[in-house]
Regions:
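Sec-dependent signal peptide recognition
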Residues: 1-7
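Histidine-centered active-site/metal-ligand motif
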Residues: 2, 178, 217
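N-terminal signal peptide c-region/cleavage motif recognized by signal peptidases
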Residues: 14-15
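Hydrophobic alpha-helical bundle signature of multipass membrane enzymes
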Residues: 23-213
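Interfacial helix-loop-helix junctions of multi-pass membrane proteins
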Residues: 206-237, 244
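C-terminal membrane module of polytopic membrane proteins
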Residues: 232-263
Length: 263
């Protein structure tokens, strides 16, 4: 899963264009593709520096039979009622952070059309910060090696990778990388566009919640994914290069034409 998530993050900052085709429930006009490829993606802000020591910050996943483990399994069982429903469909549309549906929903939360064509400084900041989350996420996943719920408690999941016996490609469950990156970006973009902080944080929380609806994560995976995102955010806040990029993103978003989406 870390390879899949990394590819999506890099695509956000280095693709020639990020389409803005929203899902039917969130119509957003399409962005015009850039005519030429964008410059090479810079590395993360922590490149060449020790990554976040996530094992000192993240609690171990619930012990089998504990109250949290029971709650996780109950939530997974209950989520079967949502198969095929609105959250299930939204989770499918937003399987990748670089997907058009994900970017359209994030744009609506920020109140500006996000793409390399329209907000390049913001997109590079978002992508670089996402790269910095991959290393600690991978360390935690490999250390705890928690199975995905659909591999232990069975049942359908919304990610097609979970089918046809290739579910192992999704990797381990704990913590949720999608939840972590969604919350990291929510914290960063709340600083870059403070007038939209409430909507942005709602989107960030929803990124993790959709992974439960997708039935690829336990509740505690998602909760502690947010802890991962917050830990990376706190570390980045001390980096001068990140602060400089944040200043550029603030100015860029303040000058961007407002984007109003249906409520």
């Amino acid at each position: 899963m870390h390879a899949i998530l990394l590819a999506a993050v890099v695509a956000m900052g280095s693709s020639g264009a990020i389409a803005q085709q929203a899902p039917a429930s969130t119509p957003v006009p399409a962005a015009t593709p850039m005519a030429t490829p964008s410059p090479a993606m810079p590395p993360g802000y922590l490149n060449g520096k020790p990554p976040v020591d996530i094992l000192k910050l993240l609690p171990a996943p619930p012990v089998p039979g504990s109250a949290q483990d029971v709650a996780d399994r109950a939530a997974y069982a209950a989520s079967a009622k949502g198969i095929g429903g609105p959250d299930w469909q939204a989770a499918i549309a937003q399987l990748s952070p670089s997907s058009p549906a994900f970017m359209a929903a994030l744009s609506c939360a920020v109140g500006a059309r996000l793409s390399l064509a329209t907000t390049p400084a913001t997109m590079v900041m978002v992508a670089r910060s996402g790269i910095d989350l991959i290393a600690p996420m991978t360390v935690a996943k490999e250390h705890y090696a928690r199975p995905r719920p659909f591999t232990t408690d069975k049942g359908e999941a919304c990610d097609p990778i979970s089918k046809d016996g290739v579910g192992a490609r999704l990797g381990y469950a704990y913590p949720s990388g999608h939840s972590g990156i969604g919350w990291l970006w929510a914290l960063i973009l709340s600083d870059a566009a403070p007038a939209h902080a409430e909507a942005i944080r709602r989107f960030g929380q929803g990124t993790g919640d959709l992974r439960v609806a997708c039935r690829v994560h336990w509740l505690s995976d998602v909760a502690n994914g947010r802890l991962l995102g917050a830990a990376v955010y706190q570390r980045l806040a001390a980096e001068p290069e990140y602060q400089a990029d944040l200043g550029r993103a603030k100015a860029e978003l303040a000058a961007a034409p407002p984007l109003v989406c249906p409520g």
